[in-house]
Structures are given as C-alpha cells and as structure tokens.
Swiss-Prot record:
Residue spans, zinc finger FPG-type: 235-269
Highest taxon above the source species: Bacteria
Details of cofactor binding: Binds 1 zinc ion per subunit.
Secretion signal span: none
GO biological process: base-excision repair
Known catalytic reactions: Hydrolysis of DNA containing ring-opened 7-methylguanine residues, releasing 2,6-diamino-4-hydroxy-5-(N-methyl)formamidopyrimidine; 2'-deoxyribonucleotide-(2'-deoxyribose 5'-phosphate)-2'-deoxyribonucleotide-DNA = a 3'-end 2'-deoxyribonucleotide-(2,3-dehydro-2,3-deoxyribose 5'-phosphate)-DNA + a 5'-end 5'-phospho-2'-deoxyribonucleoside-DNA + H(+)
Cofactor(s) it depends on: Zn(2+)
Example GO molecular function: damaged DNA binding
Name by which UniProt lists this protein: Formamidopyrimidine-DNA glycosylase
Keyword line: DNA damage, DNA repair, DNA-binding, Glycosidase, Hydrolase, Lyase, Metal-binding, Multifunctional enzyme, Zinc, Zinc-finger
Function statement: Involved in base excision repair of DNA damaged by oxidation or by mutagenic agents. Acts as a DNA glycosylase that recognizes and removes damaged bases. Has a preference for oxidized purines, such as 7,8-dihydro-8-oxoguanine (8-oxoG). Has AP (apurinic/apyrimidinic) lyase activity and introduces nicks in the DNA strand. Cleaves the DNA backbone by beta-delta elimination to generate a single-strand break at the site of the removed base with both 3'- and 5'-phosphates.
Active site positions: P2 (schiff-base intermediate with dna), E3 (proton donor), K57 (proton donor), R259 (proton donor)
Family, per entry: Belongs to the FPG family.
Length: 269
C-alpha cells in the first residue's frame, strides 16, 4: 500500500504539471472504487487548479470552488501523460488539462478513491486526523502525552491516524528499529526520552524514504513511471529470519492486527 513517502513523492511529481493549469474535464471509466466517484466530478469543467498538497495519505487538488481528494488505496498510481496515450488496463479516471496532458489514475485493486468536496469546508475524511509526522507539532512530548494509560502495542499506536498520520506498516517497523523499541511494548509504558527518540526516528525514516522516491515492493511507481528505491534501505521490514544489520541476531516476527512485524530481539526492547 502506498504510504506517506509514496504519496508525497507522487505529489512532487505531478504538481509542476497541474498547478496553475485549467482542469478542462474529467473522464471516469470505472466509478466503482473504494467509494463511488463523486457525482459532482462528472460536471467539472474549466476549473483553475489553485494548489496541490497532501494531508495524511490523501492528495488534495485545490480548485477555485472545491477540492479533489485522491487516495491511492492498495495499488493506485498517478501518471501525467499525453491525452492520446493508449490506455492501459485499470486506467479508471482521467483529468484533462489545458496543456493537453492528462492526470491518469490507475488502480488494479480499486481500493483507491477520487472524491470531491465543494466549498471551503474540509471533507469528513480529513477530520479527526493527528499531526503530520514531519511537522513541528509532532514530537516526543506529543506521543508521550497521548500514550498515557494506553495498553495497545506501540506499533499499533503510531499507526493510528489519530496519533500521527501516514506512518504505515513499513515505516512503523523501520522507525521502531531505529529507535530501539520493541513493537509489542505497551504504548503507555514507554518513557518520554524513548518517545523523543521514536519521534526523531519517524521523521528521519520518512525523510529518507521521500528522498529515495518511496518504496516499491509491487505496484507503486512514481508519477514518471519509475520505481522508488527505499526498499534497498530496509533494515527489518520483510527480513524476518535474516541477520540483524546491527548485531547479527536473527530477526523475528510477531503479528499486530493482520500485519506481520519484523524486529530484532537484541536491539529492540
């Protein structure tokens, strides 16, 4: 599933092609995504694109009188292509620009979404979200305060969007390894000092992943069609049964929710 670095990489790839352009029209070939394509999208014509930004894992395209929200789901990608480029399988939505280019949404598994919110009010999906992990408002003090009395595993705690947005399975595992914290440790039993280390690890891991263009394991490609290269830097994710890069102990795996979690039994406590 594309996580925050992949969405941020996509944003940086498409922004130069969309910001300041005119959205001429929208073509929907398959409306049956995670949520049906918003009815209002079909009527969009000649809309100036004011800005593009990201909130959590949502790409937000700001128009003069509303906002498009795009979520990549499990397998979605966005590419900026010539309008006459032949379609590929699973090309579900096209946003035609006045430049003759098209922002094309491809999603084999159809867990993504393309939604519209009119007016100035934020979409309901954007409400009740925690801070952005790369912002100044996210720090160890925030994690420490929110975790008091919580018995949930710290990995599940930092993957909760009410705690902090965009820290998915891959980057939660990598951040906990960098901070030396066992993923199963109860969130409420971690000290302020260790949460400060974890917050810094989350920021560092996400920044490194963005710099590498995200992580391509199966479906994800950047807006230019190229893969992300952070997979070459993974220390624990997908490496259970292999030696730890720091101490050579064999990495183990636990399950949190429906996800397998790799960790080092020596380095993470």
């Amino acid at each position: 599933m594309p996580e925050l670095p992949e969405v941020e990489t996509t944003l940086r790839g498409i922004r130069p092609h969309l910001q300041g352009r005119i959205l001429k029209s929208v073509t929907v070939r398959e409306p049956r995504l995670r949520w049906p394509v918003s009815e209002a999208i079909y009527a969009l014509r000649d809309c100036p694109v004011v800005a593009l930004r990201r909130r959590a894992k949502y790409l937000l395209i700001e128009l003069e009188h509303g906002q498009l929200l795009i979520h990549l789901g499990m397998s979605g990608t966005l590419r900026v292509v010539d309008m006459d480029l032949p379609l590929r399988k699973h090309d579900h939505v096209d946003l035609l620009l006045d430049s003759g280019k098209v922002l094309r949404f491809n999603d084999p598994r159809r867990f993504g979404s393309v939604l519209f919110q009119g007016g100035d009010q934020p979409h309901s999906l954007l409400q009740s979200l925690g801070p952005e992990p790369l912002s100044d408002s996210f720090n160890g003090q925030w994690l420490f305060a929110r975790s008091r009395g919580r018995k949930v595993a710290v990995k599940s705690f930092i993957m909760d969007n009410a705690t902090v947005v965009g820290v998915g399975n891959i980057y939660a595992q990598e951040s906990l390894f960098m901070a030396g914290i066992h993923p199963s440790r109860a969130a409420g039993r971690i000290s302020l000092a260790r949460y400060q280390a974890l917050a810094e690890a989350i920021k560092r891991v996400l920044a490194q992943a963005i710099e590498a263009g995200g992580t391509t394991l199966k479906d994800f490609t950047r807006a230019d069609g190229q893969p992300g290269y952070f997979a070459q830097s993974l220390n624990v994710y997908g490496r259970a049964g292999q030696p730890c890069v720091q101490c050579d102990a064999i990495l183990k795996a636990d399950r949190h929710g429906q996800r397998s979690t790799a960790y080092c039994p020596q380095c993470q406590r």
